[in-house]
């Protein structure tokens, strides 16, 4: 098979079989980025080519067809252009969130890859990620594992986020903003938080980043 030409639509509804691979076996990957208005009025986004590369790796891991990086970037750019009126103004702290995603769309009964897929991009205006401004948050070392050794922690798959829901709800119930996850094999090494990579700065100003095959590479 091959990808069709695609196109722009204002319809935000997706109609698929109730047996679709995405519904029955969580066969979906996604990316996330933002479009900003600069001080001089230009609309920009940061390195969508890297998001395209990451989605290629994610798709391959879940036995999904690779959506070419150049087409990924073009789809993102065209979608942002079509929604330029919804990009918040410079200085507002708000942005246009851009969500490219891919999923198995045809009926699948039996654990196997789907044979048909959809790649889509939608956008929505969002406020500042840190509602009260950039300030320290409370983090706990979680008793839960985010990813298994040799598992899917290094890709941006929907199933990883479903697995983290209980942990973040539990953290909030206990008065914490976020979880810090340790490596699940030895539980002695810091990996990442639920929503971001983790960076350490030593006393002499050196930046240290965790290295693990179960951490989602940042962009």
Where do the protein language model's features map onto the residues?
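Extended, Lys/Arg-enriched charged tracts that mediate electrostatic binding to polyanionic substrates
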Residues: 88-99, 103
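Helix-start/capping segments and mature chain N-termini
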Residues: 1-79, 108-219
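Intrinsically disordered, low-complexity linker/loop segments enriched in Gly/Pro
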Residues: 82, 104-105
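Short, charge-rich binding segments
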Residues: 85-91, 111-113
């Amino acid at each position: 098979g091959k990808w069709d030409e695609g196109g722009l639509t204002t319809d935000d509804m997706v109609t698929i079989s109730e047996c679709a691979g995405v519904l029955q076996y969580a066969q979906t990957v996604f990316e996330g980025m933002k479009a900003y208005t600069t001080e001089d009025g230009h609309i920009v986004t940061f390195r969508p080519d890297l998001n395209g590369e990451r989605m290629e790796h994610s798709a391959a891991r879940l036995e999904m067809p690779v959506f070419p990086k150049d087409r990924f970037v073009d789809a993102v750019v065209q979608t942002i252009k079509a929604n330029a009126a919804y990009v918040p103004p410079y200085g507002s702290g708000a942005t246009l969130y851009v969500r490219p995603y891919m999923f198995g769309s045809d009926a699948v009964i039996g654990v196997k890859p789907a044979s048909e897929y959809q790649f889509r991009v939608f956008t929505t205006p969002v406020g500042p990620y840190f509602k009260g401004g950039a300030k320290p948050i409370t983090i706990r070392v979680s008793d839960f594992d985010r990813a298994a050794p040799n598992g899917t922690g290094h890709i941006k798959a929907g199933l990883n986020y479903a697995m983290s829901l209980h942990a973040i709800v539990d953290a909030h119930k206990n008065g914490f903003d976020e979880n810090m996850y340790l490596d699940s094999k030895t539980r002695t090494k810091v990996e990442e938080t639920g929503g971001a990579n983790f960076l350490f700065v030593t006393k002499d100003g050196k930046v240290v980043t965790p290295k693990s095959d179960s951490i989602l590479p940042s962009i």
